[in-house]
Amino acid sequence: MLDPKFLRNELEVTAERLATRGFILDVERLGKLEEKRKSLQVSTEELQASRNAISKSIGQAKAKGEDVAPIMAKVGTLGAELDAKKVELAALLDELNAIAMSVPNLPDESAPIGADESENVEIRRWGTPKEFNFEVKDHVELGETLGGLDFKNAVKLTGSRFIIMKGQIARMHRALAQFMLDLHTTEHGYTEAYVPLLVNEDSLLGTGQLPKFGEDLFHTKPATEEGQGLSLIPTAEVPLTNIARDSIIDEDDLPVMMTAHTPCFRSEAGSYGRDTRGLIRQHQFDKVELVQLVKPEDSMQALEELTGHAETVLQKLGLPYRTVVLCTGDMGFGAAKTFDIEVWLPAQDTFREISSCSNMQDFQSRRMQARFKAKSAKKPSLLHTLNGSGLAVGRTLVAVLENYQNEDGSITVPEVLRGYMGGLEKIG
């Protein structure tokens, strides 16, 4: 959520910056609503002051023995007018808040301006794609031949975009998640967290999934003691970041760095017909998430470091990748700046996204009222929040299967995973 004062005072500037990400801010409508708000605010305050002044005169009139009935009638009339104005003002503020909640974050000035993913900027590459002397198979053919990926029975149990993993491939999937968690907690300084997979509406509003992306969520019917429905998490970013909601963190406790391995659930409402084959785009998938809460002046450096933490996973697995900075037109709703990490998939002969690392600045923290208190400050300030995949486990499995395949259809186990797989060197 943008700073309401900035939005009001810098409406044209805000509209120009939002236009670079393809969002058209209705400046005329907002301007009219803001003028109406100011007018209502003034008239409400004037009515309140008049009512208070006349109410005080009742006691004085009684002391003089005067008839207070006309004064009481006037107070009643003013009270009714005031109540009506308050209702009108509240409705207008709700309308303005609804607009504010639907406006995406302002792109950081360092984000390249562009319309779509074709204008993203590659900033580095690591590793060299292997040249195979045989025809490469994709992960679906490899996994099904080895008996480790069962799409047919997953469809029978649930539907499309689900998977059953078995045997050593299921074990490798688990090993990848354990390896990622161990790396981030022992070498990168993150604290592991176990979090709920179901969250309430306030949490989804806090991190920006609601109100705009409700159709991409799986919702439950009202079933809690509080009587509200819950939603399955689309990413562990939601519960991890919301831990700081309605909190004030001491400056000495920053940065807060958390990681969690969870299943994630997405309806993929806007992805009909895309990546229908294999594990690339599933309704349920595992991910190791990285979240940081930092002081504003530290957030851009923290983004570089968080992205590096995700890249280290691929480096240790020996998987070639490239890192791109997203242009303004391709960034997510709440991001001020984003780096995407794309891993090489031989069967597709291209790089595919495996991690997205974003600096949200104070966009989420303003929604959540997540703040910190500096020693020298009289009042708390909004935190900056960052998140990234460290990594998507299923897509990492895809990359390992395809990059480590052998001509006979077997898979060489990357050295860093062998300790998690009982010393196993090859699958198949």
UniProtKB/Swiss-Prot annotation:
Key words, A-Z: Aminoacyl-tRNA synthetase, ATP-binding, Cytoplasm, Ligase, Nucleotide-binding, Protein biosynthesis
Enzyme Commission number, as recorded: 6.1.1.11
Pathway entry: Aminoacyl-tRNA biosynthesis; selenocysteinyl-tRNA(Sec) biosynthesis; L-seryl-tRNA(Sec) from L-serine and tRNA(Sec): step 1/1
Pfam families xref list: Seryl_tRNA_N, tRNA-synt_2b
InterPro entries: aa-tRNA-synt_IIb, aa-tRNA-synth_II, aa-tRNA-synth_II/BPL/LPL, Ser-tRNA-ligase_type_1, Ser-tRNA-synth_1_N, SerRS_1_N_sf, SerRS_core, tRNA-bd_arm
GO MF entry, a single one: serine-tRNA ligase activity
Enzyme class: ligase
Catalytic activity: tRNA(Ser) + L-serine + ATP = L-seryl-tRNA(Ser) + AMP + diphosphate + H(+); tRNA(Sec) + L-serine + ATP = L-seryl-tRNA(Sec) + AMP + diphosphate + H(+)
One biological process term in Gene Ontology: selenocysteine biosynthetic process
Keyword Ribonucleoprotein tagged: no
Binding-site residues, L-serine: 235-237, 289, 389
Residues binding ATP: 266-268, 353-356
Compartment annotation: Cytoplasm
One GO CC term, this protein: cytoplasm
Primary site of residence: cytoplasm
PANTHER family for this protein: SERINE--TRNA LIGASE, SERYL-TRNA SYNTHETASE
Function description: Catalyzes the attachment of serine to tRNA(Ser). Is also able to aminoacylate tRNA(Sec) with serine, to form the misacylated tRNA L-seryl-tRNA(Sec), which will be further converted into selenocysteinyl-tRNA(Sec).
Free-text note on domains in this protein's UniProt record: Consists of two distinct domains, a catalytic core and a N-terminal extension that is involved in tRNA binding.
Family named by the database record: Belongs to the class-II aminoacyl-tRNA synthetase family. Type-1 seryl-tRNA synthetase subfamily.
Subunit structure as annotated in this protein's UniProt entry: Homodimer. The tRNA molecule binds across the dimer.
Identification of the protein by name: Serine--tRNA ligase
Protein's gene: serS
